[in-house]
UniProtKB/Swiss-Prot annotation:
InterPro entries: ACP, ACP-like_sf, PP-bd_ACP, Ppantetheine_attach_site. The gene is acpP. It is found in: Cytoplasm. Its main location: cytoplasm. It comes from Chlorobium phaeobacteroides (strain DSM 266 / SMG 266 / 2430). The keyword Translocase does not apply. This is Acyl carrier protein. It comes from the Bacteria. HAMAP family: Acyl_carrier. Pathway: Lipid metabolism; fatty acid biosynthesis. Belongs to the acyl carrier protein (ACP) family.
Length: 78
């Protein structure tokens, strides 16, 4: 899967989990500050990313993922 495909899928997951419009999402968007996620939303988003991309994201790594681009970069590296 290419980085562009991963980005598209991550955006789709954010739209479905957080109820935002795709045009509101930017790579630098912070889940809590810019997209209105609370801590539960963020946990659910991380779990959905794990399921969709078949990766395990340990809690200590998940805590460091606060922007859309950080999520994409993490998945690309795995």
């Amino acid at each position: 899967m290419t980085e562009a495909q991963i980005k598209e899928k991550v955006y789709d997951i954010i739209v479905s989990k957080m109820g935002v419009n795709k045009d509101q999402i930017k790579p630098e968007s912070k889940f809590s500050d810019d997209l209105g996620a609370d801590s539960l939303d963020t946990v659910e988003l991380i779990m959905e990313l794990e399921n969709e991309f078949d990766v395990q994201i340990p809690d200590e790594d998940a805590e460091k993922i606060s922007t859309v681009q950080q999520a994409i970069d993490y998945i690309v590296k795995k």
